[in-house]
Regions:
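A short beta-strand-loop structural module common to alpha/beta enzyme folds
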Residues: 43, 65-81
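Exported/periplasmic ABC-transporter solute-binding proteins
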Residues: 1-66, 93-98, 106-107, 121-126, ...
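Serine endopeptidase catalytic core focused on the charge-relay Asp
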Residues: 130
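Pocket-flanking alpha-helical
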Residues: 77-116, 217-222
């Protein structure tokens, strides 16, 4: 499959003068910061990547100083090797570090319960919407239109991104025959759905994709994109699929200052309001 990408804005990298970015080669979006100087290592469910820079700045103010933070925004199964002490490769770059904080959905956190402290819920999302091409050229009005033969659907991979796939499918399976169409005909992401699936729609390989509301909000936010990339459709069954985001410390990190401070800050109203400002439910 050819390389697909969107004009993703940088966060921590934009403050550095010298770049070797090359789309399709030396371009990395889901690993943030400097792992060599980091004081705090965090792995997190990737679909919250847009809010983290704001949360970090607020955290530094709360802490009373800046800290070097390295964080990973991937589907939880993709960063699990790091939690279990295994290396993770991005092309020829090999990373092996010990996360101190894990942020993920309840289902995933329950699978690593022997490795982390008791997870705490710090925010919820607003459920699922339908992402469509700008102008909605196929005239999609809601989930019922997805059963139309000519409509191509993109969705996260049911094997590698189990949690998001289950959530998206649950929002759509009330339409007779749609579950079967998705299982047989959908275009599935291969590695990271929060990067791949929007690109499928943007490039016209798919007409529609179920995605979390805060993604749709992000793509229309002029702070990140001067021109909105997509349109989106809300529907009741999607709004009902709100998901929780939890945070836990890796065992052995309970007495370390920064991991404890980060977890405590995520549970504050200030952090919650920042998530809400990016399209989360709070």
């Amino acid at each position: 499959m050819r390389c697909l990408t969107l004009p993703w804005p940088l966060d921590l990298g934009k403050a550095v003068k010298d770049h070797v970015d090359l789309p399709g080669s030396n371009l990395v979006y889901d690993f943030h910061g400097d792992p060599l100087s980091a004081e705090l290592f965090i792995v997190m469910e990737g679909n919250q990547f847009m809010v983290i820079p704001d949360v970090l700045e607020a955290f530094f103010r709360h802490l009373g100083r800046r800290a070097e933070v390295f964080y990973v925004t991937l589907p939880p199964p993709r960063f699990r090797p790091l939690i279990e002490g295994h290396p993770l490769a991005i092309g020829n770059l090999v990373l092996k570090f010990r996360p101190q904080v894990v942020m993920g959905p309840p289902d995933f956190m329950s699978k690593i319960k022997d490795l982390v402290t008791e997870p705490k819920t710090f925010v919820r999302n607003k459920g699922v919407v339908l992402l469509v091409q700008k102008g909605n050229p196929k005239g999609i009005k809601g989930p019922e239109d997805l059963i139309r033969e000519e409509i191509k659907i993109a969705i996260s991979n049911p094997k590698t991104e189990v949690n998001s796939f289950k959530t998206y499918l649950a929002a759509l399976e009330h339409v007779p025959g749609l579950k079967e169409k998705i299982e047989k005909e959908a275009i599935f992401s291969q590695v990271i759905h929060h990067r791949e699936v929007p690109a499928f729609v943007f490039e016209g390989l798919a007409d529609v994709a179920p995605l979390y509301f805060h993604f749709a909000y992000y793509y229309q936010n002029p702070r990140f994109f001067e021109t909105p990339l997509f349109d989106y459709l809300e529907f009741p069954e999607g709004a009902a699929q709100q998901g929780e985001y939890q945070v836990a410390l890796m065992k052995g990190a309970e007495e370390e200052e920064l991991p404890r401070a980060w977890q405590a800050f995520l549970l504050t109203n200030e952090a919650r309001e920042l998530y809400i400002s990016h399209g989360f439910a709070g």
